[in-house]
From Swiss-Prot:
It is found in: Cytoplasm. This is Phosphoglycerate kinase. Belongs to the phosphoglycerate kinase family. Substrate binds at D22, F23, N24, R38, H61, L62, G63, R64, R119, R152. It comes from Campylobacter jejuni subsp. jejuni serotype O:6 (strain 81116 / NCTC 11828). The gene is pgk. It is an enzyme of class 2 (transferase). Monomer. Keywords: ATP-binding, Cytoplasm, Glycolysis, Kinase, Nucleotide-binding, Transferase. Pathway: Carbohydrate degradation; glycolysis; pyruvate from D-glyceraldehyde 3-phosphate: step 2/5. Transmembrane segments: none annotated. One of its GO terms (molecular function) is ATP binding. It catalyses: (2R)-3-phosphoglycerate + ATP = (2R)-3-phospho-glyceroyl phosphate + ADP. GO terms for biological process: gluconeogenesis; glycolytic process.
Amino acid sequence: MSDIISIKDIDLAKKKVFIRCDFNVPQDDFLNITDDRRIRSAIPTIRYCLDNGCSVILASHLGRPKEISSKYSLEPVAKRLARLLDKEIIMAKDVIGEDAKTKAMNLKAGEILLLENLRFEKGETKNDENLAKELASMVQVYINDAFGVCHRAHSSVEAITKFFDEKHKGAGFLLQKEIDFASNLIKHPARPFVAVVGGSKVSGKLQALTNLLPKVDKLIIGGGMAFTFLKALGYDIGNSLLEEELLEEANKILTKGKNLGVKIYLPVDVVAAPACSQDAPMKFVPVQEIPNGWMGLDIGPASVRLFKEVISDAQTIWWNGPMGVFEIDKFSKGSIKMSHYISEGHATSVVGGGDTADVVARAGDADEMTFISTGGGASLELIEGKELPGVKALRSKENE
């Protein structure tokens, strides 16, 4: 992906730099940050700019605020970042208001200003050029390091790039790394290449599954989405999650896999319960024996053994989506065991999607995975072969 302008191609010396980060981090009810991976991932790019004598303006969204609310303020992010960098972070009270503009204007080399939540400005999600122009006017250089939002044409991701020429815009280290990993995975995977796809819905991953089939050697389908495939094969799945309107599509994927010589593996047993709760009774049952009115909520021990066998000779594994309702302890075992088996092997292991990254963190396997993507939707769209608006905007025109 060398046609993307990199931060290293830009003369940053003593410039004022705008870095679009992805600080969309999970918080508890008291607004404490529960996972700061995305903040830590931004540090190499921030440090590189500081080392080049820059003054740095950081911007991100957090959640999906309908209005300006302290619940969605980036204050907790500023505090965590200050701790991680061991450096004061100047916090703006707004995005392009008087406070932000004054602080941006007075920012000195080596200082960092964090703007308030970008989505407090209605124009951000509308790719508003006026907002983009206001943001661009604060700085001399634009860097995008927010892979997690590159699939969205938003003001701070796409429109803003129109106000910078190729010598003054580029991709940060995290964005570059994400794109390189996804592109190598699709173009030059070490084989056998196994995709492990889970999560609740087929609809969200249909395009990715279709695009992956010609590229993988084996495909494992788990999680709630597996039941639509099992139903398509004629199994009675009780009250398990089903996307009735996608049965035909599921059949097409199974047929396409067969025609391409790709082995597709589905669960052979499940953890079934009458309700999706920690207190519900549960039992392990073969997929053909799910009791009436019960639902499958995790893969069972025989499926875990089967999937372990399937990935045992893999050289590359791409994992997106948990194997069950991992948020509930008794239905998390399948996902956690998959995480252990994927991380213990010698394969290049790439984890995509927020839920999957949460499983890996909970299993204590994060350090053993080759790469954990910071973007859910964005990593899925790259695998689908789509051009992301935020990435396209950073392409060098000579290479288009």
